[in-house]
C-alpha cells in the first residue's frame, strides 16, 4: 500500500525525531556519586554472583552500557549481542541480536558494541564493516518506508523528483538547500524486515567511502574498537588497525547520512541512516596523541577520545577536539612524564579503556589480569582485580565498562564470564559483595 506525505508531515517528523531521541534513565539507578576519588575510597570489592555461562555468556569480547542502564555484551563465542539488566536478567525484545548473520547468511562474530542516544546498537566484527540494530524501531514496529519524493530548492523554487536509494535521492536528502514538498511511502515488507534486523550501517568497500578515504585503503580497514558519543552527535568513531605499507593505524570518524524516512506503527516519522566516511581523526605515529596498532576506544561527554594501543610507545592516549575551525583538530590531552596514565610501566598489554560519568579512567590489562584506575587528570588511583582488591583472580580480562552507580564490569574471555567490582564505601544496599 502506498500513500503520500506532505511538507507539513516532514515538519512534524522533525519534531518527532527530536522527541524520540530523548532517553530517560530509570529512577532506580543510583547516580549520586561524589565525582573525584577521595581519601576515604578504599577497596574494589567483587560483587556476587559472577556472571558466567549460566547467564548465556560464552566468549565476551566487549561490553557497553546504554543510557537506560542495560548492558550490551559483544559475545564472539555465540555470535550474539547479549543484553542484560543490572541484575543479570535477560530483558525481552532483544532476540534479534542473537545468532547474528550478514546478508550472505555468514555468521557475524562481534568484537565490540556501543549504543547511542537514538537507541542504535552498533557493533563490529574486525572487518571494514559496521552493523547496526535499532531498539526503538523494534519496539514500535515499522509501518511504511519512503519510496520517492519531490524536492524543492529553497532559493530557486525548482522541483526535482527522486527515487529512494538512488544517488540523487541521497544527495538531495542530505542537502540543506533542498526540502521535501511531497513524498510516497510503501509498506514493502521485505525492506521493513531488513531494517528491523541487524543490518549493514557502514562498509569500507562502498565506492563512495573508497573515494572519500583518499589517503588510505578503506576497503582493507580492520576495525578493532567502536564508540558512539552520548548526545545527539550524528557520528561514531572506530579504530583501524590494518597497518600495511602505509601504516594504516588510525582513528576514523563515520558520519550519519539520511537514507530513508520511516513511518512507525505509532505514527512517528523518523530517519534511517547509513554511515559514510567522515575523515581520519588521528593517524600513525609514536608520540603523544598519535596512533600505533590501536585496540580500543571510548569517548566522554565532551567529545574527548581515549584509546589503547599495542604499538610504541604509550599504551594510553587521550585527544581532545578544537572546534574553532571548519573541522575538528584533535590534540593530545596527556603528556609523557607529566601524566601518570601515560607511563607505560603500569601496563603489560592494555586492551581496553572505559570512563565513568566523571571521566575517571579504567584500563584493563589481560596479561596483568587487572584493572588500573586513574582519575580524570590522569593521576593513578588504584588497582582492581587482584591481591587485596579481589577475592577471585581473573584469567584473561579483555574489556570493561562502568555504570552510573560506579559498578565496574569486566569481561573475561578465558572463562566466559563478567566480573563486577565496586568501591567498598559506595556499595548499594542491593549489591552483595563476594563472600
Predicted regions and their residues:
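Sec-dependent signal peptide recognition
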Residues: 3-10
